[in-house]
């Protein structure tokens, strides 16, 4: 007698090592724009930069991705009770790479030097040039595509990255970088009421803040990078090379004195040639549950096989 059973698993197959298909395109594509913005709580024009980038992302939702790093003299906590120290060593190192000269808001687009837009001869640009630089990057061909997915079990992130080289890199070694960000961190922001009021969540200035700033939604906030600022070396960069790597990262309870909200973690993966970002992608994390409900069984299933391929 045939028994019909259907298993409903609230569990992603990849967490048990079953892989049905790749997550990266093997067709030649143009670059995505990875925008790294230097910002700070006490940068009064930074909310204007946030609003500008929000609009650009809305117009290019699958092609433009933003990472905001808090550093410099404007990135200090004005709350006597603490809880808003968004600065970190990775942000400080990143500032050394993009070279904003202390100007905020500023941003780097794919870490390219746009000589007509550059603030100090490096990759950082003032906000009046961001849209133009992003538009140029989106029209450039990429020799590598990047796919990423991130699963969260408890406070442990499992990050799966695939890359495919549709053409050979001019460099024999490339680098894979993984940024971890947190959305929806509520805290003070100078200039929010003037330049990005839609991100204000308080009806009046917060008297606990030293300058009576409003409570503001801090989005895309860089908290760490897997393998640090230098990334993970890729030594097979010729046409047809397929990269498949999985990383685990344990999220702490706090970064500095800022609580971690596990439901608001994002992950970006991008590949550089040692300086410029060639391509990348950004995703929200997917929570992984372990509840199993048995409804019915149809027939025995085969064994799942997981392969870790890189060639």
What are the functions of these language-model segments?
Residues 150-156, 300-310:
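Short, solvent-exposed loop/linker segments at the N-terminal edge
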Residues 22-23, 254-257, 301-302:
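Generic recognition of flexible, low-complexity loop/linker segments
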Residues 51, 62-291:
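Short, conserved sequence motifs used for protein processing/export or organelle targeting and
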Residues 24-72:
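Local sequence-structure signature of Cys/Sec-based thiol-disulfide redox active-site neighborhoods
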Residues 287-305:
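Long, low-complexity ectodomains and other extracytoplasmic segments of secretory-pathway proteins
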Residues 1-27:
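Bacterial Sec-dependent N-terminal signal peptides
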């Amino acid at each position: 007698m045939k028994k019909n059973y259907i298993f409903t698993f609230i569990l992603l197959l990849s967490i048990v090592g079953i892989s049905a298909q790749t997550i990266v395109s093997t067709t030649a594509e143009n670059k995505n724009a990875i925008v790294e913005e230097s910002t700070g709580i006490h940068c009064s024009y930074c909310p204007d930069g946030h609003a500008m980038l929000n609009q650009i992302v809305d117009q290019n939702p699958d092609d433009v991705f933003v990472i905001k790093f808090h550093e410099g003299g404007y990135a200090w906590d004005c709350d006597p009770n603490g809880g808003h120290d968004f600065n970190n060593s990775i942000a400080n190192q990143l500032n050394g790479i993009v070279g904003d000269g202390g100007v905020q808001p500023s941003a780097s687009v794919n870490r390219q030097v746009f000589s007509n837009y550059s603030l100090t001869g490096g990759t950082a640009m003032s906000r009046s040039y961001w849209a133009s630089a992003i538009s140029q990057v989106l029209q450039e061909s990429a020799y590598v595509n990047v796919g990423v997915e991130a699963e969260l079990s408890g406070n442990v992130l499992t990050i799966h990255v695939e890359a495919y080289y549709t053409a050979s890199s001019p460099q024999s070694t490339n680098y894979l970088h993984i940024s971890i960000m947190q959305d929806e961190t509520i805290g003070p922001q100078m200039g929010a009421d003037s330049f990005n009021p839609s991100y204000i969540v308080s009806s009046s200035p917060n008297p606990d803040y030293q300058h009576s700033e409003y409570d503001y939604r801090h989005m895309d906030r860089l908290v760490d990078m897997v393998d640090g600022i230098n990334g993970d070396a890729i030594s097979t960069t010729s046409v047809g090379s397929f990269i498949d790597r999985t990383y685990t990262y344990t999220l702490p309870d706090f970064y500095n004195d800022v609580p971690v909200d596990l439901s608001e973690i994002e992950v970006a993966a991008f590949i550089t040639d040692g300086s410029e970002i060639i391509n990348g992608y950004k995703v929200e994390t997917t929570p992984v549950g372990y509840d199993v409900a048995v409804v019915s069984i149809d027939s025995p299933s085969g064994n799942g096989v997981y392969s870790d391929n890189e060639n």
